[in-house]
Amino acid sequence: MKRFAVVTLFPDAIDCWLQASVVGRARGRAFDVLYVNPRDFAKDRYRSVDDYMFGGGPGMLMRYDVLKPALDHAKILVQNPLVLALSAGGKVLNQEMCTILSSYEGDIVLLCGHYEGMDDRIFDHVDLEVSVGDYVLSGGELGAAVIMETVIRLLPGFVEKSDNVRKESFTNNLLEEPQFTRPREYEGKEVPEVLLSGHHQRIELWKKEQRIKRTLVQRPDLLTSAKLEPMDLQILRRVLTDMEKVKRAIFGEQSN
């Protein structure tokens, strides 16, 4: 069972997510979460965890003399920990990283900053800085929740039908195909006939073509590292040819 030790000022923010999320059902079976609050390691009667920056600057930084003992304690609670810090300058989280983290044999420590950030000295004790995207959050708790969910979903014991995970978007660096449920028709919008045909080979071919087409249109950057089989490449060429024909029909032969 993989354990996550989260260093955070706001453990309730993550615990509320766990209680509401589907991954919470696997707690105690596929994973567990422990919390370490840096405020418990504050040295003054006010339990201060932040202070003004040396050299000036807006906002407050979390103190190194509070973060370091909190991180040390978190590492004691788990086995062979990999320490990740949520950081805007970190390596951007993707499905490949999630797969690597899920297969890591030890446990994971997540260090969440708050306020204007953390005293930079704490990063000397971190194995990897991770960002969940190019935007600003007020703290690392949401990012930690994202990392945990993406990793937990890949752990043995989380999804009974592991095929569900393997077929999700990004698993092979391709987006999922369009998906439909009842009713078959509503307000003139119909489910593609092929999905109702009962012809499993045609259905699988349609799904594969739609995955490639959707990825090409919405996230072409993923195709550079996608694991494409010879048939996938044939489909990709056909889709590109069809798109070029449409482009010429709309813009003319000289379109670029």
Swiss-Prot record:
Molecular-function GO term, any one: tRNA (guanine(37)-N1)-methyltransferase activity
Coiled-coil regions, chain positions: none
Keyword Cytoplasm applies: yes
Annotated positions binding S-adenosyl-L-methionine: 113, 132-137
Location of the protein in the cell: Cytoplasm
Leading EC class: transferase
Catalytic activity: guanosine(37) in tRNA + S-adenosyl-L-methionine = N(1)-methylguanosine(37) in tRNA + S-adenosyl-L-homocysteine + H(+)
One GO CC term on file: cytosol
Keyword S-adenosyl-L-methionine: yes
Entry EC no(s): 2.1.1.228
UniProt-listed InterPro entries: Alpha/beta_knot_MTases (IPR029028), tRNA_m1G_MeTrfase_C_sf (IPR023148), tRNA_m1G_MeTrfase_TrmD (IPR002649), tRNA_m1G_MTases_N (IPR029026), tRNA_MeTrfase_TRMD/TRM10 (IPR016009)
Gene Ontology BP terms: tRNA N1-guanine methylation
Keywords, ordered alphabetically: Cytoplasm, Methyltransferase, S-adenosyl-L-methionine, Transferase, tRNA processing
Sequence similarity: Belongs to the RNA methyltransferase TrmD family.
Record text on subunit structure and interactions: Homodimer.
Main function: Specifically methylates guanosine-37 in various tRNAs.
UniProt name for this protein: tRNA (guanine-N(1)-)-methyltransferase
Biological source species: Coprothermobacter proteolyticus (strain ATCC 35245 / DSM 5265 / OCM 4 / BT)
Encoding gene, per UniProt annotation: trmD
